[in-house]
Structures are given as C-alpha cells and as structure tokens.
Amino acid sequence: MAVQKLYESQSKLFQPIKVGNMQLQHRMVHAPATRLRCLDNGLVMTDLVKEYYKQRSSIPGTLLITESLFSGAKSGGFSNIPCLYNDEHVEAWKPIVQAIHDNDCFVFIQFWNLPGELKVDYLEDQERLEKVTQGECPMDPTGLPAALGSAYSICGEELYVDKFMTKQDIQEHITTYTEAAKRAVFGCGADGVEVHQVNGFLLDKFVLNGYGDKCDPEYCGSLENRARFCLELLESVVNAIGQERVGYRISPFSDIWKDKDSFEAHVFMIKKIKERFPNLAYLHAIEPRQYWNGHVHITQEKNTLIYKNLWGDPFITAGGHDRDSAIQMAEQENTLVAFGRYFLSNPDLPFRLKYNLPLNKWDRATFYTKMSPKGYIDYPFSKEFLDTKKVE
C-alpha cells in the first residue's frame, strides 16, 4: 500500500543534513534515555539492547544517541546502568553499534558522571562496601551530604555518598572519560560521543556552582574556574578522537542547583566551547518544557534558540517536542530535533512523523523496568511502515 505524502513532508525536518562526519537523511534524532536494561555489573544485555536500537534505526540516515554510560568505576553507582571501561564492556557494545550501522544509521555514545551520590543498596554486600571504603565511589566537589535528596532517584533508589574531589581526582576523571571515548569510537565503532553537562550531574554541578567554594581553588569560585573541568575534559576527548566526533549536551533551564548565574554560565560555556572547538559535531540543548523529576515544566516565553544563535550550527533541541513543534524548530538553520518518549514508543518514529501517522502512547511504568523486554522492544511498527518493507 502506497503511503500518501503530505504537505508537511517537505519540511526541513525531513530533509538531509550533515552533522560532524555524518550525512543524515533527516533531522529527527533519538534522544539519550536511561532504561536500566543492563546487568548489575554494568554489562549491557547485548541481545535485548541490540534489538531495541536495531528497531529504532529502521529508517536509514537516523542519528541515535545512546543512553548514558559510566566511563569509569568511579563515575557511577546506579545498578543496571551500562559502563564502558573494560574490554568486556566493549565486546558487549560492538554488536549493538554494528546493528545500527547495518541499518545505515549513526550512533553517538553518551557518557555521564553522577554528582557524588550512590544508591542506598550499594552498601548491601561486602564486595561493594569494600569498593566504597577503598575510595571507589563517585566523586563530588563538596564532600558534603547530598544536596539533591529525593530529587535524584530511579525506581525509588536514592543516592547519598559524597567524596571531596581533589585536582588529582579531576584529572583521573578526565583520563577515564577520554579512555571511554576512545573505546566507544575505536573499540565499539561508534560514530562519536556526547559529553553530558546536564541536570545537575557532575560536570553541570561544577559549572553551576553547586558546591560553593568547597573544591580545589583552580576549579571553583569564578565562572572561568568552574568551567575549567569541562573545558579540560573536552580538550582531552577532542585530542583523542577528533572534534567532529564529539557532541555536547546542556540543560540551560534546569534549576537543580538554583544558580542565579545559570544563564551567564551557559553563555560563557557555549562561547568558550565554540571558540576552542569550532568543529564540534553539535550542541544539544534541552528545552524548558522538559519532563524532569516527575514534573512537567512548560515555559512558553523561553526556549533554546538564544543558545542556538550563540552556537551556530549544527544544533539539536530536545524536550517535550511533538510533530508540530519539531517542524517549527527545524525551520531554524541546521537545527535537528531529538525525541525521547516518542522514540522509545515508536520504533519507526521518523516515518510516522513524515507521513503524519498516529503515534503509539508510551507506558511510563516500563521506563525503568530493570532488564525487561516489556515496554522496551514490544512497541509495534506502523502498518504503513511494514507495508513499505513488503514492497521492498
């Protein structure tokens, strides 16, 4: 059955664009989304996760940004979060990346660092307790009790352990992050990596003064000092894999640290990054109408365009977009739109949006269902998409 093209299919949203070294066939991006389909030791469930990304790379020329991976043993603490700091992790991700490439699509692997808290049940067994007592726990600039409380939990698992972050700790993080980026690109075969300065996590916490002056003097106090960690990390990663293989994500409207200078901080960061790394693959910014910590934040008078204008091209916007807002945003020069919930519930999302087809509704109860295929690989493709595959 032929699918009738609609007027909207001529929107820039559905037109090709070059991002970094990649020639994409449209401007709809799979947004990074934590899903907990991973073993407790950080080893991804390859067959399950491969099927998920294989489904969502069903439209050739799509860019997929993965869920966040921990770059090192001291980066995290959540159970069921994937990691990429040893050969076993690399071997588990290789088939996933290959499945995406087999569908003529592209993949950037995102890395993150917790802002210092560990989940409560991290201390439930002796092996993990030894890791904590030996210093193998997430780093935080403060050494103070967790500032976020219940604001940082997944499936009710709360985090709490903090450790003061020395200059040596910071350099160690930069090294492990860089090694993980090299594993992603040269080991797993990914097209690039995304650096995560988002929603109050470690890099964001530095930039937004989430710790006051309780840190090494070189990395706290003035905005220039607070930005140093991120810029040094970016420089190290770029030197290792190339600017065109690196994207950068920010959440300029997040109020986790309630920094009164948040706007100035993000403007400073964007200008510095653009000045030092003009060929970075993209800037990825979250809109103020994001869904975060159980609440929908809608601020009509604010959007990410001011940051897009500072940055230039290419630019990815994410957070609460539907088809209409995506089409509108894509009219901006060299702008892409990332989808999270709609992409997880619609494996053929770019096809559905292009032809204005009904969308599957997501099941929020399965977002963080550990190691389960339910609500992960069982969302149906549209009949119209399946019909086109029959014709082929």
Swiss-Prot record:
<keyword id="KW-0521">NADP</keyword>
<dbReference type="GO" id="GO:0003959">
    <property type="term" value="F:NADPH dehydrogenase activity"/>
</dbReference>
<protein>
    <recommendedName>
        <fullName>Putative NADPH dehydrogenase C5H10.10</fullName>
        <ecNumber>1.6.99.1</ecNumber>
    </recommendedName>
</protein>
<dbReference type="GO" id="GO:0005634">
    <property type="term" value="C:nucleus"/>
</dbReference>
<feature type="binding site">
    <location>
        <position position="196"/>
    </location>
    <ligand>
        <name>FMN</name>
    </ligand>
</feature>
<feature type="binding site">
    <location>
        <position position="196"/>
    </location>
    <ligand>
        <name>substrate</name>
    </ligand>
</feature>
<dbReference type="InterPro" id="IPR013785">
    <property type="entry name" value="Aldolase_TIM"/>
</dbReference>
<feature type="binding site">
    <location>
        <position position="34"/>
    </location>
    <ligand>
        <name>FMN</name>
    </ligand>
</feature>
<keyword id="KW-0285">Flavoprotein</keyword>
<dbReference type="Pfam" id="PF00724">
    <property type="entry name" value="Oxidored_FMN"/>
</dbReference>
<dbReference type="GO" id="GO:1990748">
    <property type="term" value="P:cellular detoxification"/>
</dbReference>
<keyword id="KW-0560">Oxidoreductase</keyword>
<feature type="binding site">
    <location>
        <position position="199"/>
    </location>
    <ligand>
        <name>substrate</name>
    </ligand>
</feature>
<dbReference type="GO" id="GO:0016491">
    <property type="term" value="F:oxidoreductase activity"/>
</dbReference>
<dbReference type="InterPro" id="IPR045247">
    <property type="entry name" value="Oye-like"/>
</dbReference>
<dbReference type="InterPro" id="IPR001155">
    <property type="entry name" value="OxRdtase_FMN_N"/>
</dbReference>
<feature type="binding site">
    <location>
        <position position="368"/>
    </location>
    <ligand>
        <name>substrate</name>
    </ligand>
</feature>
<dbReference type="GO" id="GO:0005829">
    <property type="term" value="C:cytosol"/>
</dbReference>
<feature type="binding site">
    <location>
        <position position="249"/>
    </location>
    <ligand>
        <name>FMN</name>
    </ligand>
</feature>
<feature type="binding site">
    <location>
        <position position="341"/>
    </location>
    <ligand>
        <name>FMN</name>
    </ligand>
</feature>
<dbReference type="GO" id="GO:0010181">
    <property type="term" value="F:FMN binding"/>
</dbReference>
<comment type="subunit">
    <text>Homodimer or heterodimer.</text>
</comment>
<keyword id="KW-0288">FMN</keyword>
<comment type="similarity">
    <text>Belongs to the NADH:flavin oxidoreductase/NADH oxidase family.</text>
</comment>
